[in-house]
């Protein structure tokens, strides 16, 4: 063996690096166990702060360096944030209001929502249509782009400046998000910009148990504003007039030339009206019987018909508070106050915003204040903004209530003094991200640049708010377009199931290798598997990549790849021994002859893994990461490390009589002369019929699409007692109603076998960008289940807590926005197509014959169609979910990777025989090549199926669908190598297939 020194050096370096990085996990566990012996929590923390691992690394360093666990193993939160590129463009254009710009923005938004695409390109195309003959510089020669865009700039120069500014905004947003998470104290967060998805940032936060806080913190743009306000008495008459107009059927569709006159008349009418004062109170009456409930509903409907606005909004409150409303009515009120009628009736300089917290002066819960802000600038922006804030602290006021104190720079202090001096006796509203946090009365001029945000806050609220302000302002609003929350208890169960499936699969593989290849070769292969796991975990830890349940599956599957390499080598050694060579020569020839097949099969699998890593998100990336590492490590351990050991032993005249078979495997598929090429017409017919059935099933039954492809929310609810999915569907049938009055689509399927775990899916308000919709959906779910006596939790907070299992609770949740669903759909299609194209090209380059590329690609396409077809035929008929989600797409790509591995081995033997017998009969040559690799095919398929069955049975629900798809892929991928790929390659070679004689065909070799 050449280059032994390099192999030994790499092995030693990998060993030392793996020991070093894995040692942090053991150190952390040791320090935790020692700290647990200390009863005082403060003393516990002091002990952890004092430790120094290896004399250098603190306890926090150990936490951050130890092997990280993903959300499904540790619990936590995964979100994808989308930075609003349209808002960035509006900021760059200084919020221009000319028709060309606004129409172009509206058109670009509509096109992006319908078809996706690059928003900047969509906007520029729309602008050229809506403002023909006008240059982009007319819009973007602003203060924000000073030095980059001038009135004389060409459209190309402006586009370049816009794209640069958009990318800068995304980069700044990424930095702000990272700073906020660091201040929150999340250990081992994973924050990354998603390549190829402009404006999207993925954030993984293991161990997070307060998703509501994280949602607020991540989506807050820290857009702080100080506004002058109206008094409530000034605005009440306008709201009464608006209520009357809406009740009389005014829909705002009148002609434009009548608007001015109508507005003037409205103001005169309002001027005559006597302001109506209302006390700030809410009375909530409880009705016990069903008849009272029906009567109450009828009264409410009549009241809303007579007073669409004021039946929902109670006027009064004083200062800037014009009224109060229940949180459930805010959407309907917003629809009225932002309507075309409201634009004609309400003052043009009025801006109505809700309070951030429920009113603290009312006994009723979930009642919010509506504040009246006065626009005093020509641009419509606040007279004082958050860019003047230099510091923010969470403190307590004189009454002991939590507040946030802020300091301003010199310019901000000057403007603040002017603003407070001009508004003595009135309120100044402090607005953050479009909601009013406080609106205190100004008693006198405030100099020195000090201000304070007070309200109905908790200590956590003020701490998060101060951290958000200190982290900096987001250049554009960010919203969560995809979210997954996993409870820690569910994570612990996943760890247990993952470890059990891993250990059982590992033991079965070890037993199988010894059973098929005898003690010494079998144990050598098993030793390589152990080293494989050790190196994989070490490399994974050094990359600070989180280990997930799909990641564990990837590691287990990579063991199958390692076994395949050993099987190829051992089968080759057996062939050389049967040909009469000595042990040393047979081992050398076996490793040498198997190298090309191992290299090609591993590289094609690696191509698939890289595509998974690039196109996948969340669990798919975790699987791809460990699979890629496992493929590389298995190649090194199987091809080089085991060779070192064999060479060492054989050079010392040991293992000279080692056996590579057992009574079980001695004659396995030896001397077989199956005439596979004679069957191609039959097998092609069967394949075509199967394809027709599968395609027909797509049209008749379709596929069970998950929210990854439709958009929506999933809630995995664990009940105290067994329930039926149909019962849940009935209970939730009318519960989720969208803001426009339409029923949301709702579904329920059973998870697991205990009958107590149900996954509820709904597309309720999935198009809405409001941060309150998530809480609304969870509240609706709780109320519906509570009313049906299916859960006994006393509050929605307890129901949302994944650790409070008694009484029923949400143990995990997922949200996928519609834009993400479209991107996932297109990404899935592109990733599969790209994988097929990449493999086609690689096979063409390596085998230098298009026949092998065509044969493998057609067979791979059939493999993918077969797996998808079975999912279409079987969903709803098997006792586990067969939904099409991102994990399933990962399974399809993995099937492609495994299947091409098998085909490459067969094609490699055909290529070898073609070189040995260039003028031999092609039909006999193909048959002989397939027969010669049958033993390897059976051993590899069997060992891989053992692994997959362990994952499917023991690995848990989250990867059962994945493993089932892989089982189908292994079975049909193996068959397609023999009955589709090889005959197709033979046909494309251009040789006419001759009918074989009935008698035995002599083997080519």
What is each PLM-predicted segment?
Residues 560-604, 647-655, 872, 878-940, ...:
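Cytosolic juxtamembrane regions of multi-pass inner-membrane proteins
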């Amino acid at each position: 063996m050449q280059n032994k020194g390099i192999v030994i050096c790499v092995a030693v370096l990998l060993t030392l690096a793996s020991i070093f990085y894995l040692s942090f996990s053991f150190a952390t566990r040791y320090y935790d166990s020692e700290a647990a012996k200390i009863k005082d929590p403060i003393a516990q923390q002091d002990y952890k702060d004092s430790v120094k691992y290896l004399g250098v690394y603190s306890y926090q360093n150990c936490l951050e360096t130890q092997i990280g666990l993903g959300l499904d193993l540790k619990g936590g939160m995964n979100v994808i944030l989308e930075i609003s590129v349209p808002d960035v463009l509006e900021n760059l254009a200084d919020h221009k209001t000319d028709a060309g710009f606004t129409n172009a923005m509206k058109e670009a938004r509509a096109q992006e929502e319908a078809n996706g695409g690059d928003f900047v390109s969509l906007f520029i195309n729309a602008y050229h249509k809506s403002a023909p003959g006008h240059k982009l510089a007319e819009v973007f020669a602003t203060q924000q782009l000073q030095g980059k865009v001038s009135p004389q700039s060409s459209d190309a120069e402006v586009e370049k400046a816009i794209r640069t500014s958009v990318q800068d905004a995304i980069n700044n947003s990424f930095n702000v998000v990272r700073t906020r998470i660091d201040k929150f104290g999340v250990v081992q967060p994973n924050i990354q910009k998603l390549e190829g998805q402009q404006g999207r940032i993925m954030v993984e936060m293991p161990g997070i148990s307060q998703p509501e806080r994280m949602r607020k913190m991540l989506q807050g743009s820290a857009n702080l504003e100080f506004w002058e306000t109206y008094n409530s008495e000034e605005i009440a008459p306008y709201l009464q007039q608006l209520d009357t107009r809406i009740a009389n059927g005014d829909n705002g569709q009148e002609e434009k030339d009548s608007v001015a006159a109508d507005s003037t008349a409205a103001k005169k009418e309002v001027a005559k009206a006597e302001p109506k004062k209302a006390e700030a109170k809410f009375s909530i009456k409880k009705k016990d019987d069903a008849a009272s409930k029906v009567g109450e509903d009828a009264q409410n409907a009549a009241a809303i018909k007579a007073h669409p606005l004021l039946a929902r909004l109670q006027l009064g409150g004083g200062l800037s508070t014009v009224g109060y409303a229940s949180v459930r009515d805010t959407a309907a009120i917003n629809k009225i106050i932002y309507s075309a009628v409201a634009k004609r009736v309400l003052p043009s300089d009025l801006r109505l915003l809700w309070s951030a917290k429920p009113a603290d002066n009312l006994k009723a819960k979930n009642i919010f204040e509506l504040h009246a802000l006065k626009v005093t600038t020509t641009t419509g922006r606040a007279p004082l903004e958050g860019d003047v804030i230099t510091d923010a602290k969470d403190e307590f006021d004189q009454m002991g209530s939590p507040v946030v104190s802020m300091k301003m720079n010199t310019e901000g202090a000057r403007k603040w003094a002017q603003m407070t001096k001009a508004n003595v006796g009135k309120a100044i509203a402090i607005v953050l991200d479009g909601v009013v946090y406080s609106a205190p009365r100004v008693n006198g001029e405030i100099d020195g640049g000090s201000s304070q945000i007070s309200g109905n806050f908790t200590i956590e609220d003020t701490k998060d708010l101060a951290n958000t302000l200190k982290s900096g302002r987001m250049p554009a609003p960010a919203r969560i377009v995809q979210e997954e929350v996993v409870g820690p208890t569910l994570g612990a169960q996943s760890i247990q199931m993952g470890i059990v499936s891993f250990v059982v699969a590992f033991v079965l593989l070890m037993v199988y290798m010894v059973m098929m290849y005898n003690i010494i070769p079998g144990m050598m292969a098993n030793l390589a598997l152990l080293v494989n796991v050790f190196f994989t975990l070490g490399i994974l830890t050094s990359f600070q990549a989180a280990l997930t349940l799909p990641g564990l599956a990837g590691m287990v599957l990579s063991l199958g790849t390692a076994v395949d390499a050993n099987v190829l080598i051992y089968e080759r050694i057996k062939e050389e021994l049967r040909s009469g060579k000595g042990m040393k020569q047979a081992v050398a020839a076996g490793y040498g002859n198997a190298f090309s097949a191992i290299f090609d099969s591993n590289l094609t699998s690696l191509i698939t893994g890289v595509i998974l890593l690039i196109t996948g998100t969340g669990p798919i990336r975790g699987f791809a990461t460990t699979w890629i590492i496992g493929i590389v490590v298995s190649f090194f351990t199987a091809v080089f490390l085991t060779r070192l050991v064999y060479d060492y032993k054989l050079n010392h005249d040991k293992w000279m009589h080692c056996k590579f078979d057992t009574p079980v495997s001695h004659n396995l598929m030896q001397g077989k002369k199956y005439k596979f090429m004679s069957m191609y017409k039959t097998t092609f017919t069967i394949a075509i019929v199967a394809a027709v059935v599968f395609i027909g099933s797509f049209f008749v039954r379709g596929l069970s699409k998950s929210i990854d492809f439709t958009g929506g929310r999933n809630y995995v609810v664990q009940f105290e007692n067994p329930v039926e999915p149909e019962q849940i569907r009935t209970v939730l049938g009318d519960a989720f109603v969208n803001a426009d009055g339409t029923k949301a689509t709702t579904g329920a399927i059973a998870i697991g076998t205990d009958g107590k775990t149900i996954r509820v899916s709904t597309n309720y308000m999935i198009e809405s960008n409001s941060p309150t919709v998530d809480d609304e959906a969870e509240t609706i779910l709780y109320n519906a289940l509570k009313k049906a006596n299916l859960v006994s939790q006393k509050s929605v907070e307890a129901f949302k807590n994944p650790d409070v299992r008694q009484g029923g609770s949400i143990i995990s949740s997922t949200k996928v926005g519609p834009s993400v669903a479209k991107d996932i759909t297109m990404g899935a299609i592109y990733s599969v197509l790209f994988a097929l194209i990449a493999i086609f090209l690689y096979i063409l380059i390596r085998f230098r014959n298009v026949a092998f590329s065509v044969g493998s690609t057609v067979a791979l396409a059939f493999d993918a169609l077969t797996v998808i077809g079975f999912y279409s035929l079987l969903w709803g008929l098997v006792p586990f979910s067969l939904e099409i989600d991102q994990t399933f797409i990962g399974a399809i790509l993995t099937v492609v990777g495994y299947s091409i591995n098998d085909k490459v081995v067969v094609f490699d033997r055909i290529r070898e025989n073609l070189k040995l017998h260039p003028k031999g009969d092609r039909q006999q040559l193909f048959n002989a090549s397939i027969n010669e690799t049958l033993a390897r095919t059976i051993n590899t398929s069997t060992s891989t199926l053992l692994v997959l069955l362990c994952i499917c049975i023991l690995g848990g629900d989250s990867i059962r669908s994945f493993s089932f798809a892989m089982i189908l892929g292994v079975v049909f991928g193996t068959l397609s190598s023999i009955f589709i790929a090889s005959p197709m390659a033979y046909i494309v070679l251009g040789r006419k297939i001759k009918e074989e004689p009935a008698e035995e065909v002599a083997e080519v070799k």
